[in-house]
């Protein structure tokens, strides 16, 4: 059994990225810049944003955090996004989710300029992804794919079950893996026999946030298991995932830990997406 060490791979990605950014800075180009919009004071969102900003600093990406209270109006948020869209110093915009209930997430995700859409949630970027074109990909799905690639795991012709159908992870991941030649089964809360799908799969990817959902008897021998769940165990207060790790790992050929698996990859892909958008803007503003 091999641990898919997202922390290690993420560190390597960040080291490479810093060198690439330094190359641009040595040519007197401006720094890449990420603008982060954080609404309210949700502890999980605060932690995620803090980690993202620290990661930006490590690789030489400038970041600006724009904080707003829980009661921000739609008009105020729309105005702020428009300002960032029109600010040539900003290469990428991150709207930290979830938003308060009175704000329509899709409305504001679609308001972000697709050429500044660091999360890859804009319909234009998702349409390109659907058609198999190079684009800005959602961070967690592309992080999972790059983690598999780092361990030379080829998904072509693999039977893959994805549990969870969110627009952030499950759906885009299914499209991307399908475009790479995998056979995909998608399961949700209405799936009658989850075990029927997972037991036959070469790769099982769980994205539900339900502790210990995936148990040993649901996995075939030498399967690859990817755990996207992040849950605080109410008894131990430790961070755990969807997978009963200690028991499931006995059967796996590869498995991601929680923490230290998919999470670090998501952050490093945010950095890569920011740099990708930066390069587009450099080409547009400096080289044309």
Swiss-Prot record:
Domain of life of the organism encoding this protein: Bacteria
A GO cellular-component term linked to this record: cytosol
Protein's pathway: One-carbon metabolism; tetrahydrofolate interconversion
EC number from the UniProt entry: 1.5.1.5, 3.5.4.9
Classification via InterPro entries: Aminoacid_DH-like_N_sf, NAD(P)-bd_dom_sf, THF_DH/CycHdrlase, THF_DH/CycHdrlase_cat_dom, THF_DH/CycHdrlase_CS, THF_DH/CycHdrlase_NAD-bd_dom
Reaction it catalyzes: (6R)-5,10-methylene-5,6,7,8-tetrahydrofolate + NADP(+) = (6R)-5,10-methenyltetrahydrofolate + NADPH; (6R)-5,10-methenyltetrahydrofolate + H2O = (6R)-10-formyltetrahydrofolate + H(+)
Signal sequence segment: none
Keywords, sorted A to Z: Amino-acid biosynthesis, Histidine biosynthesis, Hydrolase, Methionine biosynthesis, Multifunctional enzyme, NADP, One-carbon metabolism, Oxidoreductase, Purine biosynthesis
A biological process from GO: tetrahydrofolate interconversion
Residues involved in NADP(+) binding: 164-166, 230
Molecular function GO labels: methenyltetrahydrofolate cyclohydrolase activity; methylenetetrahydrofolate dehydrogenase (NADP+) activity
Disulphide bridges, residue numbers: none
Family, per entry: Belongs to the tetrahydrofolate dehydrogenase/cyclohydrolase family.
Subunit-level organization: Homodimer.
Described function: Catalyzes the oxidation of 5,10-methylenetetrahydrofolate to 5,10-methenyltetrahydrofolate and then the hydrolysis of 5,10-methenyltetrahydrofolate to 10-formyltetrahydrofolate.
Protein name as catalogued: Bifunctional protein FolD
Gene: folD
């Amino acid at each position: 059994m091999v641990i898919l060490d997202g922390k290690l791979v993420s560190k390597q990605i960040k080291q490479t990225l810093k060198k690439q950014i330094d190359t641009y800075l040595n040519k007197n180009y401006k720094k890449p810049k990420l603008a982060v919009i954080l609404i309210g004071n949700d502890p999980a969102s605060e932690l995620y944003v803090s980690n993202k900003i620290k990661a930006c600093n490590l690789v030489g990406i400038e970041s600006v955090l724009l904080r707003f209270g829980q009661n921000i109006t739609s008009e105020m948020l729309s105005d702020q996004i428009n300002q960032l869209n029109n600010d040539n110093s900003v290469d990428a915009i991150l709207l930290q989710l979830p938003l308060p209930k009175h704000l329509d997430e899709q409305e504001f995700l679609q308001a972000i300029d697709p050429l500044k859409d660091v999360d890859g949630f804009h319909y234009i970027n998702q349409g390109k992804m659907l058609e198999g074109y190079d684009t800005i990909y959602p961070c967690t799905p592309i992080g999972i794919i790059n983690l598999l690639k780092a361990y030379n795991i080829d998904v072509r012709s693999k039977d893959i079950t994805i549990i969870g159908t969110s627009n952030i992870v499950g759906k885009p991941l299914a499209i991307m893996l399908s475009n790479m030649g995998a056979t995909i089964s998608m399961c949700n809360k209405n799936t009658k026999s989850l075990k029927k799908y997972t037991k036959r799969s070469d790769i099982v990817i769980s994205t539900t946030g339900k502790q210990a959902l995936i148990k040993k008897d649901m996995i075939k021998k030498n399967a690859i298991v990817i755990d996207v769940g992040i849950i605080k165990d109410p008894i131990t207060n430790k961070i755990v995932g969807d997978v009963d790790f200690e028991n499931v790992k006995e059967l796996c050929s590869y498995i991601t830990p929680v923490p230290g698996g998919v999470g670090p990859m998501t952050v490093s892909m945010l950095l890569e997406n920011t740099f990708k958008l930066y390069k587009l803007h450099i080409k547009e503003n400096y080289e044309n």
